[in-house]
Amino acid sequence: MAKTPTRARKRVKKQVADGMAHIHASFNNTIVTITDRQGNALSWATAGGSGFRGSRKSTPFAAQIAAERAAEAAKEYGLKNVEVFVNGPGPGRESSIRALNAAGFRVTNITDVTPIPHNGCRPPKKRRV
């Protein structure tokens, strides 16, 4: 008996009106993740994955390109409004927010969620170059 081929259903992308953009800006790289309101990732992009290597990865322009790529992928879900959460001290903080705004998203809120110790662990020793 020959099996009839079962067709896989085409996945319908859920329509999300508003979501959150998490920007992790370290000194070496910038990671932009766009999620829905529950925190489920819709799209993400990094400066390193956008073709920048080495010291060019840690530039504001690389963060801008990463934010544009993440925004382009998130537009397939019908995203209109984003709430931005910025984490880290890196150079790509402001430029990635501007790129999300220029991509057509309405930035409703910007929150800095960088962890600040209340005098916790001892920091690493100063660099001698």
UniProtKB/Swiss-Prot annotation:
One of its GO terms (cellular component) is ribonucleoprotein complex. GO terms for biological process: translation. InterPro entries: Ribosomal_uS11, Ribosomal_uS11_bac-type, Ribosomal_uS11_CS, Ribosomal_uS11_sf. The keyword Ribosomal protein applies. The keyword RNA-binding applies. Keywords: Ribonucleoprotein, Ribosomal protein, RNA-binding, rRNA-binding. GO terms for molecular function: rRNA binding; structural constituent of ribosome. Located on the platform of the 30S subunit, it bridges several disparate RNA helices of the 16S rRNA. Forms part of the Shine-Dalgarno cleft in the 70S ribosome. HAMAP family: Ribosomal_uS11. Belongs to the universal ribosomal protein uS11 family. NCBIfam families: PRK05309.1, uS11_bact. Part of the 30S ribosomal subunit. Interacts with proteins S7 and S18. Binds to IF-3. This is Small ribosomal subunit protein uS11.
